[in-house]
Amino acid sequence: MSFGDFSKICQRTPLPLCSVVKSAKQMVLTNDTTIKNSRLDIIDLGIIPVCYARSIDVANTMIFEIGNAFINIVAFFLLIIIIYNVRRKVTAIGRSEYSYFFQTCLVLIIFTLIVDCGVSAPGSSAYPYLVSVQLGLAGACCWMLSVLGLLGFRLWEDGTFKSMLLLYGMSFGGFILNFVVSIVTFKEWIQRKSDMSTDTMGLFTVMYVINALALLIYIICLLIVSVKVLQNYWATGAILLGVFFFVAGQVLIYAFSNNICEGMNHYLDGMFFGSLCNLFAIMMLYKNWDMSTDDDLEFSVSIDSTEYSTFNSDIKL
């Protein structure tokens, strides 16, 4: 696989973007047989994966990736619970920032359900735009994490207008870059190769290089903060476990999706297990923040049967 080429990736993994990018090479058999110079002017179906999870028909509605959809629905409700718990920690560091991040993840889950499950069918006029929005939201989440990682060094005060403006700016920048590069690639507004393959170099670079660098910044910052600053090794374990789940999910999606699909008789593919691992990674991300922060209610009042007291021993009521 050459850098910037989605043909091998899409032949092994049924990513939503594969329906809107084209390649002159199509791998059509499970023994990796490749057909070159396909008539893409006639067969304009994107890059077809060798194996993918079968669809089901419910009330005359075709639903794709039903297993992956189930995991994303679970993730949707789990994120609602996480957002509620984040909002409850009133004085915790990064409360507003992490709340906004998880809210963005919630919107990403909604668009993932739309493009993965066939709510907007591949081939429809709206599909390239919806996939671009999904990729834009994924990029926004990655870019926000780089800011959240730096927040642990207290370079600026959390929850302030400056802090939120920086977070909004980074998320907007990540969304715009990923969305624009995606839609320009899908609609082929800049150039078209002579063999009619989609030029995906820019999209590949943004998705797998720039966004990955943002994630790397977040991981490095959190490890430094948890080990050197907080000396909280439970938090360190949480982030390492999250990294493990995330990497495992990517490997299952991009390397073993065909094997899983064939082994499961087309009922599940790598997308199911990849989404499950990503869900665990998000849970570990939240757990790391939860263990690294306290609800410092210095002037909270507790009431017992005899008298009023506070958690600050210097203050008496």
UniProtKB/Swiss-Prot annotation:
An example molecular function term from Gene Ontology annotations: unfolded protein binding
Keyword Transport set for record: yes
Keywords, comma-separated and alphabetical: Cell wall biogenesis/degradation, Endoplasmic reticulum, Membrane, Protein transport, Transmembrane, Transmembrane helix, Transport
GO BP, sorted A to Z: cell wall organization; protein folding; protein transport
Membrane topology of this protein: Multi-pass membrane protein
Transmembrane segments annotated in the record for this chain: 63-83, 101-121, 133-153, 164-184, 204-224, 236-256, 266-286
Entry's localization field: Endoplasmic reticulum membrane
Highest rank taxon of the organism: Eukaryota
GO CC annotation terms, alphabetical: endoplasmic reticulum membrane
Assembly, per entry: Interacts with CHS3.
Family label: Belongs to the CHS7 family.
Entry function: Chaperone required for the export of the chitin synthase CHS3 from the endoplasmic reticulum.
Name of protein: Chitin synthase export chaperone
Lineage: Eukaryota, Fungi, Dikarya, Ascomycota, Saccharomycotina
Gene name of the record: CHS7
